[in-house]
Amino acid sequence: LNLLTVICSRNPTKDLIDCLEGIKQFYPDADIAIIDSDSDATEVYRSVDVPVHYLKNKNYELGAWKLAYELYGDYDAYLCIQDTLIPQNRLPVETLCCDQVMSYFNITGFKYDDLADLAIELTEDTIYHDVVSKHRISEDFRLATHNSFLIPNGKLSYLINALPNLPVDKRGSMAYERILGLAITQSVGSVIRMNHSFNKRHGSRQ
């Protein structure tokens, strides 16, 4: 399986170095690329030995995955992760089939109407507009949040084309985590949770 690991990073810290070390340990044959999402602090990139590409707007994860596919569109599969996900063991990438996604996700929701409204706005003119609107229940817009996943080429291409309205700030990124969760679960045959293979580090990054 020809695998590319894409790491989305913003204002990177030592977490990025630890993430890279884990990828190299558990996926030694995979290629790696970092997509930066308009960082103010980039000093950590001087310590890495993989390509770093700069996306000069705050499109966060989905923008990173889209740019990576534009630059590296010929891989069999893509491990798309945030730089705060530290690998703990190897995913069975060889068993990934064309109608399957392995995803790091949690079940959570919005507590404010404006974030739910933003999710609906971001899906305007897409095939997911009606279903996102339907999932909005009172003040609690509850969906699985997917922002990191192992995905076959064809499914990543589909998501990028099906969700063209990219987020431009952190609030938009929060909304898009829910939108991606909905799009992934509705577009593949099965979703396998990969949380056990990563340690999520939480910080105060903006």
Which residues make up each language-model segment?
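ER/Golgi luminal nucleotide-sugar-dependent glycosyltransferases, focusing on the catalytic module
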Residues: 1-206
